[in-house]
Amino acid sequence: MMKKNVININPCEKIESPKLKKSLPKVLNVEEVNKLLNYEAKTALEYRNKAMLELVYSCGLRVSELVNLNVNDINLNECYVSVFGKGKKQRIIPISSIALKVLDEYIKVYRPTLLKGYLTDKLFLSSYGKGITRQGFFKILNEI
């Protein structure tokens, strides 16, 4: 109506748009968390899975942060992980002793067998020797 010069003032000018509800992410219950943390690892891939689960739980990482980690982002001597999160902000996060033990063994014993001749700095590798993806992590989580 303003464009056609029927009215001079926009009657909706001071009306605020309704706020959309943000849905909370699905969280695991205590039983589900215990099941994940008590995951038994026997193979290189299972040990990788355990290392990922321990690190996510211990450090409160987002899945995107986890799958983008490189080997040099983990400092085993100083017990921390360096993460680039949302907005490319760097965070230094301490790693629990349990997660550190699992990560140490994964990096030294199991990760080299997963490389399959590829050269990559990615910390967590797929069965093809390349960096694991978000979808790959969620698939693993659903299988456990």
Stretch-by-stretch model annotation:
Residues 1-144:
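Conserved catalytic core of the tyrosine transesterase superfamily
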